[in-house]
């Protein structure tokens, strides 16, 4: 069988990054709608309503109306197969989000046009920089009053340090929003609000100086558009494929996801310009997506995707080759061969058994505790994919039991949740405390909820005097022993038994780093 490269070349795997409430979940819905993957897009507003958005599905997400876990959706568009990885947009779910960004080939950045660049977007962009991921930008919420579009582009360029190439340009906004002009095609698409799952047929006016344009949008807005475009074409960047692929330039689209307008414009851009599945660095060599032999890595583990089955699913990005049902793969970390007969493909929460999957696809493996984040699977070769990071937590709590007899279940639950990346656990060397570290407050709630529902353990938190944590290593054994002896009260083991320095204050950490220049304090570590 020759390896069908056309299957790989059809794949586009991307994630959406945004600040909470910029409209990411709505965009996810509408993308699926345009990809015919769902018939009714559940707009995400009514938190108490029965129609929950398709990609939000764990219990707590249903209650809070936020996407906590990363789901994966696949849909066809423009002769491509698009894999969309939905990343948690809420303040608190960053570590999972960060890791998901290691499994995609491009990102869609969604910006609320009334607000501009916000703090979470800045953080997520920093993570995409680790791999120079190509970025497409969608300026959302044009059906509301927005900031000046030129100002928005300037802000993206100055704050996020990426050049902007506008592809479409808005005509009016809020109640006066009339549509967008496509710079490359010299066409105006007139806005008619489509709600829910109604996609309106779009009226197109050809040419910027077409008198029909003045009739359609009014003389004032037509003239304003021509004036603005003169400025834009003088001041902004042309789209360059090369610079886009290197992550130096972003094509910018304007629209309103809620009004079903503009979503197809950026999807056209994504399928036309975004890279097909890319090669990936492993510890021994670079693995190309065109290789025939299968390889893939686990970037996320999620518990209880199926309330009916108490199970965990490991999400694996296929890097090369083809997955076929029943194939034998080597689980490199433990050196064992496993037969994978029941991998899953996803349409957020609806599971289907995968018969086959190609480079760029995401498949789910049933996990009974043997798979960890960062694990590599191959068809026999011993290699490990790199670049799946653990991030030092920023928030810490001591966790203890209401019923002290369940200490064993608590530890088991915490270690499993830490392998899954839901939280990090630290066990100080000098006492029996259990310290939980997270990148956001909401993770603490999730852990208590899941300990209760999955492990039947009732736990409560107490404040703990920890400001930050760093993984520590030292090449000089003698100096490391001295460091460990003198700092025992600040040392702990994490869920994977890695030595960690737990600092009560940032000042304490800085002093320790000055005092022990041979010890390396890591803010991130490879899984």
From Swiss-Prot:
GTP binds at residues 18-25, 86-90, 140-143. It comes from the Bacteria. Pfam families: EF-G_D2, GTP_EFTU, RF3_C. Keywords: Cytoplasm, GTP-binding, Nucleotide-binding, Protein biosynthesis. GO terms for biological process: regulation of translational termination. The keyword Nucleotide-binding applies. GO terms for molecular function: GTP binding; GTPase activity; guanosine tetraphosphate binding; translation release factor activity, codon nonspecific; translation release factor activity, codon specific. One of its GO terms (cellular component) is cytosol. Gene3D superfamilies: P-loop containing nucleotide triphosphate hydrolases (3.40.50.300), Peptide chain release factor 3, domain III (3.30.70.3280). It is found in: Cytoplasm. Residues 9-278 form the tr-type G domain. PROSITE patterns: G_TR_1, G_TR_2. InterPro entries: EF-G-like_DII, EFG_III/V, G_TR_CS, P-loop_NTPase, PrfC, RF3_C, RF3_dom_3_sf, RF3_GTP-bd. Increases the formation of ribosomal termination complexes and stimulates activities of RF-1 and RF-2. It binds guanine nucleotides and has strong preference for UGA stop codons. It may interact directly with the ribosome. The stimulation of RF-1 and RF-2 is significantly reduced by GTP and GDP, but not by GMP. Belongs to the TRAFAC class translation factor GTPase superfamily. Classic translation factor GTPase family. PrfC subfamily. This is Peptide chain release factor 3.
């Amino acid at each position: 069988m020759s390896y069908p490269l056309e299957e790989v070349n059809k794949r586009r795997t991307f994630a959406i990054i945004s600040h909470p409430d910029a409209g990411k979940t709505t965009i996810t819905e509408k993308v699926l709608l345009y990809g015919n993957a769902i018939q009714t897009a559940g707009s995400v507003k009514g938190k108490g309503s029965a129609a929950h958005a398709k990609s939000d599905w764990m219990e707590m997400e249903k209650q809070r109306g936020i996407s906590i876990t990363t789901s994966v959706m696949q849909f066809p568009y423009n002769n491509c197969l698009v894999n969309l990885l939905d990343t948690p947009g809420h303040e608190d779910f960053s570590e999972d989000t960060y890791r998901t960004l290691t499994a995609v080939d491009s990102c869609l950045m969604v910006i609320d046009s009334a607000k501009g660049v916000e703090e979470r977007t800045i953080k997520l962009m920093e993570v995409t920089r680790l791999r120079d991921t190509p970025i497409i930008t969608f300026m959302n919420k044009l059906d509301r009053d927005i900031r000046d579009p030129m100002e928005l582009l300037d802000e993206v360029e100055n704050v996020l340090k990426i050049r902007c190439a506008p592809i479409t340009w808005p005509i009016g906004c809020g109640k006066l929003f009339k549509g967008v002009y496509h710079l490359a095609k010299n066409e105006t698409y007139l806005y008619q609000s489509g709600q829910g799952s109604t996609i309106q047929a779009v009226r197109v006016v050809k040419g910027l100086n077409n008198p029909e344009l003045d009739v359609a949008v009014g003389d004032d807005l037509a003239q304003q558009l021509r004036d603005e475009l003169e400025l834009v074409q003088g001041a902004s960047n042309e789209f360059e494929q090369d610079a886009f692929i290197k992550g130096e330039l972003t094509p910018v689209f304007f629209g309103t996801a809620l009004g079903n307008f503009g979503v197809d414009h950026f999807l056209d851009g994504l399928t036309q310009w975004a890279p097909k599945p890319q090669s990936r660095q492993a510890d021994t060599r670079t693995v190309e997506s065109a290789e025939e032999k299968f390889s893939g890595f686990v970037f996320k583990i999620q518990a209880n995707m199926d309330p009916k089955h108490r199970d965990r699913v490991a999400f694996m990005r296929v890097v090369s080759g083809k997955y076929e049902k029943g194939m034998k793969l080597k689980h490199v970390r433990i050196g064992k061969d496993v037969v994978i007969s029941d991998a899953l493909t996803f349409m957020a929460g609806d599971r289907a058994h995968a018969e086959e999957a190609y480079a760029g696809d995401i498949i789910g493996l049933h996990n009974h505790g043997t798979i960890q984040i960062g694990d590599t699977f191959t068809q026999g070769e011993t290699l490990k994919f790199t670049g799946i990071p653990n991030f030092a937590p920023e928030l810490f709590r001591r966790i203890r039991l209401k019923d002290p007899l369940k200490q064993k279940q608590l530890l088991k639950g915490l270690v499993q949740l830490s392998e899954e990346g839901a939280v990090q656990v630290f066990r100080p060397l000098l006492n029996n405390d259990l310290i939980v570290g997270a990148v956001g407050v909401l993770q603490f709630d999730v852990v208590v909820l899941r300990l209760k529902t999955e492990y039947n353990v009732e736990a409560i938190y107490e404040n703990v005097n920890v400001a930050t944590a760093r993984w520590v290593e030292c090449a000089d054994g003698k100096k490391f022993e001295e460091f460990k002896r003198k700092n025992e009260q600040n040392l702990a083991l994490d869920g994977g038994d890695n030595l960690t320095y737990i600092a009560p204050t940032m000042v304490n950490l800085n002093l320790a780093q000055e005092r022990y220049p041979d010890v390396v304090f890591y803010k991130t570590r490879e899984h």
